[in-house]
């Protein structure tokens, strides 16, 4: 009888957990839809400004002074902008992006530091004992463009002052609801567009290309950081929704298994009671 009570208590406990994970799944689904819309809406602009900047950087600057964000110099120190969630419960997303950044940082033979977005990233960088230049947490589920400007400002200031010679950005790219891809790519200096031999650029710039480039470069860095954060948020909410759905399904499966065990134990208990009654009646006869 004690075993039946324990099993019944376990079924009730798992059922309560299933209710919680189901509620979390629904919340994540709602946030995911909004995050996906924002991330996908900004993707065409981000891709186009990247293309224009890379094309401009490939043009000869006619003796103009090179913009500091384009300056290539011997790499003596590297920085990584590491973008992660503030919270967990999103499957393997946090572990995957942390592994990507951690492997890269630990492989470097020169000093490397991190500018970290998200509490999970902050904890990870501290755990692997790497230098952290700055940390930004609690940006929320819907950060605005202005909210991310201090992040890009830290990166640009360090690069232009010569403290950092190369900047990489690590974030989780949203592919589909079920697929999120950890990405690590160079942000600074801007990589010029490599054109096939004989191919000409089709852009006509007014004013001249150098003026446009100098004006757009800071915006490009700011937009790249902002878009990477939006992609990471969309990936986080998608991964969390899938993780909570899997948790709910697993809870339902466990409830089914426990119910079967409970029914067998109850049937065995009833059979034993009947045998005791029959045995007692036979003894009295």
From Swiss-Prot:
The lineage of its organism: Bacteria, Bacillati, Chloroflexota, Dehalococcoidia, Dehalococcoidales. NCBIfam families: ATPsyn_F1gamma (TIGR01146). GO terms for biological process: proton motive force-driven plasma membrane ATP synthesis. Keywords: ATP synthesis, Cell membrane, CF(1), Hydrogen ion transport, Ion transport, Membrane, Transport. InterPro entries: ATP_synth_F1_ATPase_gsu, ATP_synth_F1_gsu, ATP_synth_F1_gsu_CS. Belongs to the ATPase gamma chain family. This is ATP synthase gamma chain. HAMAP family: ATP_synth_gamma_bact (MF_00815). GO terms for molecular function: ATP binding; proton-transporting ATP synthase activity, rotational mechanism. It is a peripheral membrane protein. Transmembrane segments: none annotated. Gene3D superfamilies: 3.40.1380.10, ATP synthase, gamma subunit, helix hairpin domain. Produces ATP from ADP in the presence of a proton gradient across the membrane. The gamma chain is believed to be important in regulating ATPase activity and the flow of protons through the CF(0) complex. The keyword Cell membrane applies.
């Amino acid at each position: 009888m004690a075993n039946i009570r324990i099993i019944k208590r376990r079924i009730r406990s798992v059922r309560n957990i299933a209710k919680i994970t189901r509620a979390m799944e629904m919340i994540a689904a709602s946030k995911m839809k909004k995050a996906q819309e924002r991330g996908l809406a900004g993707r065409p602009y981000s891709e186009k400004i990247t293309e224009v900047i890379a094309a401009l950087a490939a043009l000869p600057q006619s003796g103009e002074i090179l913009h500091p964000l384009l300056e290539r110099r011997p790499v003596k120190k590297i920085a990584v902008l590491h973008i992660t969630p503030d919270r967990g419960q999103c499957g393997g997303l946090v572990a995957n992006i942390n592994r990507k950044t951690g492997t890269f940082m630990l492989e470097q033979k020169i000093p490397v530091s991190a500018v970290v977005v998200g509490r999970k990233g902050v904890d990870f960088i501290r755990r692997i004992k790497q230098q952290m230049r700055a940390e930004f947490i609690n940006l929320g589920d819907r950060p605005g463009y202005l909210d991310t400007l201090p992040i890009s400002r830290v990166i640009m200031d360090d690069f232009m002052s010569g403290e950092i010679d190369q900047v990489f950005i690590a974030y989780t790219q949203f592919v589909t609801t079920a697929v999120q891809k950890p990405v690590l790519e160079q942000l600074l200096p801007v990589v010029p567009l490599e054109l096939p031999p004989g191919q000409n650029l089709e852009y006509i710039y007014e004013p001249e290309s150098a003026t446009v480039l100098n004006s757009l470069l800071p915006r490009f860095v700011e937009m790249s950081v902002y878009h990477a954060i939006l992609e990471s948020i969309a990936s986080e909410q998608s991964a969390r929704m899938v993780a909570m759905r899997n948790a709910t399904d697993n809870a339902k499966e466990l409830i089914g298994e426990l119910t079967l065990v409970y029914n067998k134990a109850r049937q065995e208990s009833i059979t034993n009671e009947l045998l005791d009654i029959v045995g007692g009646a036979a003894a009295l006869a």
